[in-house]
Swiss-Prot record:
Protein name per its UniProtKB record: Kinesin-like protein KIN-14P
Stretches assigned to the Kinesin motor domain: 426-748
Species whose genome carries this gene: Oryza sativa subsp. japonica (Rice)
Residues that, per the record, bind ATP: 509-516
Domain of life: Eukaryota
Top-level taxonomy: Eukaryota, Viridiplantae, Streptophyta, Embryophyta, Tracheophyta
PROSITE patterns: CH, KINESIN_MOTOR_2
Domain Calponin-homology (CH): 53-172
Coiled coil: 756-784
Alphabetic keyword roster: ATP-binding, Coiled coil, Microtubule, Motor protein, Nucleotide-binding
Gene name, Swiss-Prot/TrEMBL: KIN14P
Biased composition (Polar residues): 972-984
Matching CDD domains: CH_AtKIN14-like, KISc_C_terminal
Amino acid sequence: MGSPEGEEAVVATAAVVEDGLRGNGDGGGGGVGEVVGVGRSIDMEWRKAEEAAIRRYEAANWLRRVVGVVCGKDLAEEPSEEEFRLGLRNGIVLCNALNKVQPGSVPKVVEAPSDSADGAALCAYQYFENVRNFLMGLQDLGLPTFEASDLEKGGKGVRVVDCVLSLRSFSESKQVGRSAPLKYGGILKPSMSGKHFIRKNSEPFVKTMVRSYSAELLRDGVSLEQSLGLDFSLEHVERTTPDSIRMLVQTMLSDKKPEEIPSLVESLLSRVIHEFERRTANQNESVKHALDPNDDKLLSRADTPPEMESTCTCSTGNMDEEDHTSVSMKEEVSTAVLVNGENVVEHIQAKQTDKYFDQQQKHIKDLKSNLATMKSGMEHIKLQYSEDLDKLGKHVHTLSHAASGYHKVLEENRKLYNQIQDLRGNIRVYCRVRPFLPGKVSSSSSVAGLEDRTITVMTPSKHGKDARKSFTFNRVFGPLATQEQVFADMQPLIRSVLDGYNVCIFAYGQTGSGKTFTMSGPKVLTEEGLGVNYRALNDLFNIQAQRKDTFCYEISVQMIEIYNEQVRDLLQNETVDIKNSSQKGIAVPDANIVPVTSTSDVIDLMNLGQKNRAVCSTAMNDRSSRSHSCLTVHVQGRDLTSRTVLRGCMHLVDLAGSERVDKSEVVGDRLKEAQHINKSLAALGDVIASLAQKNAHVPYRNSKLTQLLQDSLGGQAKTLMFVHIAPEPDAIGESISTLKFAERVATVELGAAKSNKEGGEVKELKEQIACLKAALAKKDGETESIRSTQSSPDIYRMRMGSAPPAFRNPMEEVGNLETRSNGTPRQKKRNFELPDVENDTSSWLDTSSQKEAALGEWVNNSQFGSSNSLLELGPDATQDVVFYQRNSPEPQWSWAGSVATEDSDDFEVTTSCSSEQDMVRPTSAPKAPGSANGSASIARKAQPKGAKSTDIRSTNPAKRAAPLQKKINGPPSASTKNGKQLSLSAADGKRAPNGKVSAKK
């Protein structure tokens, strides 16, 4: 393009560019350019204002987050330009923000008074000091700054906003740890913005690269020529065109948004091409008109553009040469434009690609470095974690070992503690705190603290301060304790029933404290809500099934209530009486006893009992129990191997709650019920107090309740009291009274409980005794004739010591006697009536054959001819026969003479649970009425045949006696006292007022 024609074409191109730029920037030009220019001018002004406001809001919000409130003032979220300038005018906000981003950048910030109004000017020194320090800090960081005058009215607030946003960008880059150079002066936009690269498929990649790169350079204030190093063949343009063209381009593009620059460049290029096409077409038209002979030359010159006049004038000679010249010039212009455009695109693409690759390489290096650092860090952390885990594992192992040892020791301590409790016979006391009722949850509770065995309650103080008092029991359960947890702690106590022990568990507390819930459960039974009654019987059934190969158990239940001092059977709804001396330890024998074999049977019986129980609604409890309920479980077990019989009894008592009449608001029958309840509970308190003080007299009979619990509280059972308290603050008085009573109960020592166990041999011997008693009753009638024929001299002679001596051996076991065979033969004593001895003294000298015949007759009559016979005589027992022989042609043996007397050790018979004195009586007895005055003794009359045998009042094996074979041994000793021998009737004989002996009924 060194020819004059090429230079002129370039000049024309520059002119078109200048016209296009001026048309876009100033609104000049005609046609479509003017319309587009005006529309874009209006739109640009609006966009610029909106962008400035958005950037100002962003700067203000960032300052609000970083600095906060300064001098009691705060920047608005969306400040105007004036508000923004006034807020930053004193420089305090700017200095504080800079110190937040880069600590220590401004060593001293001059603070303004807190009461200064907005916009109030500081002194010149303060103003200059803060702003100068801020600008110096920005310069040290390499950030763009502004002039101090920009903070004054009429200053350029845009530069202040750009400065704040650049500081924000620096802060963000510092937080994320970016090391790449950043560009400041507005919102931080990465050089490879994804927004520019996400284009439509129809837009070439080259245009995208050009637009992105051009937008960044123009935002940084760098000219297109300086950035690209290209001149677009502008060397010729600079020689022929003024510098205002370049300034115009820079001015127009510097105020545009990055996204608007590509469209502006496209519009400029399209106008240049359009202008070239238009001028080329005009030139062709001019040439055609010039070749037309009819046209005037002046007209042709007028229509020809000025740039082509010289060409047309110089080519008047040869029209083909002119046409060739114009065509070649058009091609050269088009080629120059295309070549320059391609070179620009290629250069931009190459430079952008190189820059992109450099950045990517740098990023890759940074990533590799970071990856290596992270790997080494992870290895170090992994090693450290491994060491820490090893240490932690060893520590956990040590703790688990210590914890297992602690739990083991704790369990051993608990077992030892329970053993001590069993030996001492203390009443176990458990405490349970009821949770707040639904809908009555209170923010405050009277319970201040709960531990395993200690409860602390808040007590009202006289000085207005809450005092605390602690109580210690065997176990304390909080409001969150479940029914299963409560039962698990008392389960060993309940299971001891199967071992033959008596157990008593009773719930105590004020009304509405949860006693019935603990013992029976909620109104609607669920598996989780089953109370102690159901769980205890279910546990007994399970153990019964487990021991079915070794033990045979029979379980039966009673259910009674004490209502207004009347004992009622809940299973029959009848009134019954309490008999503490009844058989087999049953306190209420008249109550219905129902055998049970499964939990369903128990549930049916409990439902029936609860249905018949007296329950009423009061102001304190909608389901208040108006009576004391007692579920008694009787267990009788038999060892299949040793035939040992075990008997156990368990009382599960749900006491009615104590209540205050003013709170329960009861009247009429309810008031009477409350009075009886409080009276019986007071009697229980008196019994506990007497037991705690170890008084000789304990007032059990003051109430039906204490009379029912006499066996349990008197030392014959393992006893547990379950106290219940309510957590409401208004019930603190009743709670403290309940806890004090429970604390006193815990000090009571009842002694070790005894197991109700009897061996198989003892049971058989008792059965034999019962049979002997029955036979004795039948033979009592036959002794009447023998007693009437006895003479009084025989009685006198027997009392004076002429009777054969008798011997007593020490008692080794109650009911178990043995006869020794080493020594002098011993005569067995028999009970003889005084008339029998007096009438016939020759009976002392009967022969051995007569004795054997009489003995055989006795065996036949008593129906005990088997090996179980009570009398077994050895070969050397001839003297015994002489002692028992009667002098009669047909001797008759009295049954009373074949049974041991109370003075003899041959046979002893127990008749009641309190008959130890009956089994072995003193050797002294009242004298016969006839012996005092020397007259003949009065003949005794025997008991009629129809007399019944004595009832057995107790089945306690320790209280029973059974006959065993006894051998003869030892030296003779007289069984006389004061020279007079005693004469008693049968074991159960009782002297009548007339001197006769009759069987005890």
